[in-house]
Amino acid sequence: MTAAKPNILVIWGDDIGIWNLSCYSRGMMGYQTPNIDRIANEGMLFTDSYGEQSCTAGRSSFITGQSVYRTGMSKVGMPGVDIGLQKEDPTIAELLKPLGYATGQFGKNHLGDLNKYLPTVHGFDEFFGNLYHLNAEEEPEHEDYPTAEEAPILRKALLPRGVIHSWATEEDSDEVDERYGPVGKQRIEDTGPLTKLRMETVDDETTSAAVDFIKRQHEADVPFFVWMNLTHMHFRTHTKPESRGQAGRWQSPYHDTMVDHDRNVGTLLDLVDELGIADDTIVIYSTDNGPHANSWPDGATTPFRSEKATNWEGAFRIPEMVRWPGKIKPGTVSNEIVQHHDWLPTFLAAAGDPDIVDKLKSGHKAGADGDTEYKVHIDGYNLLPYLTGEVDKSPRRGMIYFSDDGDVLGIRADNWKIVFMEQRCQGTLQVWFEPFTKLRAPKLFNLRTDPFERADVTSNTYWDWMIDRLFLMFYGSAIVTQFLETFKEFPPRQEPASFTISHAVEELEKFLATGGG
């Protein structure tokens, strides 16, 4: 492997709360995460890093470098629904393949469950993992779930797919699955359902597969890009019996599993050390979105307002840290704004292609064959000059907050957050059911003087303070308008999915139209 092409190891948890990592909370939660902390201590920790407000959105934003408003990938809805990652939207993996990278994805995907949406037809050489969030995959074990005898058509149409192991192939298979569609250029093995029992150890399974993949690439002297998506700590948490109590007295099974989660991160870090490739490997730890706090104590913790699926910082603000020995100064704490979109241009720059954003705007060939034409608008910025100390500021000065229905909830511009729509529900699962309230005039927050967005609730002078700064709402409107201008040339790819019954009915009607076989 040449120094110009570093390995890239991206490790994600699921719904990880900032305060559940001891590098942020300083042990306040009663346990430690020494392996995750090690990445922060040996690299750069971010305080102002943003994902999206839910799982699919955060994952699609990262892997495509595009806004969910652009890709339509804010959620994928029910199993079997024909919504997922489109072939026209290149992934980090597809852009790295022509540069000589081996690409592997392990763990949760959640970007569509049809064959055409699997990672191995979107630039990854190998995939081993699940396709949904955990609570959806344990539903078939519920006592009230319809049996095959009671509702055979419904069960067959809505049953989640199993844990998939797939490999990219050069040959285009002529096999067509009646539910999941054409197989395409991949070989697919269904390793069985992700049961509640298997959930206890599935992260160990996928971590082992990632270890094997990395070893093979190292032996072949090929640079690798690995996206390791651990399923923990998504609701519901199923803790190994032998792990119970390891977080300490008066703790919880959730914290016990956080210790296991940290241990899997350590397995990958230890491997990088054992292979002697630490100096040649970019390592990132992060997550998709803010915590699902309403399931506490089986849920994560954040100091920011509210939680996942809202407009507040608690939904979007995420833990993030990056290590690259010799390039990124260890022990750095960054207060600069970064967002998941930014890693695509950053990784490509690190791999030797700093002009990828401009290339993709005008048309660029990439993909596994190196000959697939892509023309897209990347919403990310190249962070590499900032990470390596060449410049003092992140190129990103703000971001736009979207709901999972594609609504513009607000914007951040430097210190300022301007809120157009707000979730007024204070907590519980109701935050997923109650609609956002559209404000007649936007609210304003200063995320430096009020980082936890408390002022409109607690301050006697909030409204006086805000009325003196109403001019900033026009600033916010101008930023959104500028963003929307890009859609003249690059229109939205598809509409977001829905958690309502509409998509399920559509799929059931399609299924019945084929005879329900």
Predicted region positions:
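Formylglycine-dependent sulfatase
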Residues: M1-K438, P442, P451-G517
